[in-house]
Regions:
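C-terminal non-catalytic interaction/assembly regions of soluble proteins
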Residues: 243, 248-332
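Short glycine-rich or small-residue beta-strand-to-loop segments that form or flank ligand, phosphate
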Residues: 2, 48-55, 71-74, 100-109, ...
Length: 332
């Protein structure tokens, strides 16, 4: 496979260096830990600190959501691997202004374990850290055990809304509460058309046959709900939207925000083709689309596919979603 790589074993380090140089007006590397990137103005006096983190390979997640009125720091892991507990701890300490720290991350075993270890270590230093995990992946666990679901593209809404609440002076508990409310009202589904390949491995870590698609695939290639024959885009879009709405069960007349993310190798043109039918389906269900985000928001290296995320809104979530924000991955 042909790639723009120096040494595959050091691609994350090279990427972080480039990211920080390109966005030096917003982010910088932590002096305490090279695997922590923080907002240039962090810690912000009088504000709850916000931290996220996760494995590399999902860019712009997670680096891209550090910035003004967004996350204050990110712990950076190797490709598809959790950041270390030390990286999370150093991220917490780098953004604490005395108001506590909210850690908002996706629901994966390694992240859960390392965040909890870091929280215990921070507590010994007198820093209070509370957390919320994104659990939006409808394909990863049944509705009855939603707390076991993985976090995928829905994390973007959690970061945007949590960041806005903190920027507006919310307390730690208020930030945690609104982040959890966002998670509780967010559902996502992914469809994969072709696999991804980790640079150091050099070949795909799973296969999708030509003419097939994997419905409900995970962001690391986790098996989906099933493998199906490839369909026209309008049929795929409707199947994705139906899967999300059937699980969410929003009341008729509800307003929603929609995020359509490519998975790394998907032309933006095709995301708009999908979205055209997604909105038509949502309107048929009596839903009103309030805000739309289309592009690469949470990817999976070079996987060809798409993620659909829907957030059911209320007045508070609408206000926070609209609040000014600027980071490499999103600007409002």
């Amino acid at each position: 496979m042909q790639r723009f790589v120096n040494d595959p074993d050091y691609i994350v380090e090279d990427m972080v260096k480039g990211y920080v140089k390109a966005h030096k007006d917003l982010i910088k590397r932590s002096e305490a830990n090279d695997r922590v990137v923080q907002y240039v103005n962090a810690p912000v006096e009088g504000k709850v600190g916000l931290v996220t983190g996760g494995g590399s390979g999902h860019e712009p997640a997670f680096l891209g959501y550090v910035g003004k009125n967004m996350m204050d720091a990110v712990a950076v892991g190797e490709i598809f691997s959790s950041p270390s507990a030390q990286a999370f701890y150093d991220a917490f300490m780098s953004v604490d202004s005395g108001k506590g720290v909210a850690c908002l991350f996706g629901n994966y075993a390694g992240d859960n374990m390392n965040v909890k270890m870091a929280i215990r270590k921070a507590k010994k230093q007198g820093v209070t850290v509370k957390y919320v995990v994104a659990t939006d992946d409808v394909a990863s666990s049944p509705k009855e055990t939603k707390e076991k679901r993985h976090g995928i593209a829905g994390g973007v809404f959690m970061w945007k809304i949590g960041g806005a609440k903190a920027a507006l002076g919310g307390t730690l508990d208020e930030v945690i509460d609104v982040a959890q409310k966002t998670v509780d009202n967010t559902i996502s589904i992914c469809v994969g058309l072709s696999p991804c390949a980790i640079p150091a491995v050099g070949h795909p870590n799973f296969e999708i046959e030509d003419g097939k698609m994997e419905f409900g695939i995970g962001h690391h290639g986790e098996p989906g709900i099933n493998v199906q024959d490839l369909k026209p885009a309008k049929d795929i879009a409707r199947q994705m939207a139906k899967s999300v709405i059937d699980d969410m069960e929003p009341e008729e007349g509800s307003e929603v925000a929609v995020l359509m993310s490519g998975l790394g190798a998907t032309p933006v043109m095709e995301l708009y083709v999908l979205y055209d039918e997604v909105e038509a389906y949502l309107e048929e269900q009596g839903l009103s689309v309030y805000k739309v985000f289309i592009g690469d928001y949470v990817t999976s290296l070079d996987m060809n596919g798409a993620a659909l995320t829907v957030l059911k809104l209320d007045d508070e979530l609408k206000e926070l979603l609209d609040h000014e924000a600027k980071s490499p991955g999103i600007e409002v």
